[in-house]
Design a protein with these regions (language model features):
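An exposed, glycine/acidic-rich loop-and-rim segment of catalytic or binding clefts
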Residues: 1-158
Length: 158
């Protein structure tokens, strides 16, 4: 089933072959990481580009009021019949496309385990920021953030 992913991010966190952050945050312009205008995943992931497992730094300033909180669009996934929007108050999200899933026993006995057969959108802090002295919380300090996953039937579906 074809689907597209849009992530309004101007930069991403580069990772090495072990999927560890390098500390570099390149611009997405002109790269497979440019998902600002939506990309079909079947076209984006191929022999030359093995898939996504990166943190995207959101560039959207279009805040949305939701239950008294200011949230921004982090991602939108459009399938044939359904659409999903992800809203957050964080500065980015990790996008993963099941690069390391191997054919094997089905999940829960009925969902096939297929490479690139799943995607994950996780809002939160950038991986590896503790190396930069960020992302620490004191004992007893409360940490909260808000993420909303909204799934709807596509109205423009023929």
């Amino acid at each position: 089933m074809p689907f597209s992913v849009t992530i309004p991010a101007s930069r991403y966190t580069e990772v090495d072959k072990r999927i560890l952050p390098t500390g570099r945050r390149p611009d997405v312009e002109g790269t497979p990481y440019d998902l600002r205008y939506g990309r079909l995943m079947g076209e984006a992931i191929n022999d030359d580009f093995p898939g996504y497992d990166n943190y995207f730094h959101l560039a959207s300033d279009d805040d949305i009021e939701y239950c008294g909180k200011r949230l921004r669009l982090a991602a939108e996934v459009l399938g044939e019949a359904l659409a999903m929007s992800v809203l957050t108050d964080k500065g980015g999200l990790q996008f993963y496309t099941g690069n390391f899933l191997k054919d094997g026993p089905d999940f829960f006995g009925k969902f096939p385990r297929i490479k690139h057969g799943a995607l994950c959108l996780e809002t939160g802090e950038e991986p590896g920021i503790v190396k930069e002295g960020r992302g620490f919380y004191d004992a007893g300090e409360e940490y909260t953030h808000t993420t909303v996953y909204s799934v709807r039937k596509r109205q423009d579906n023929p």
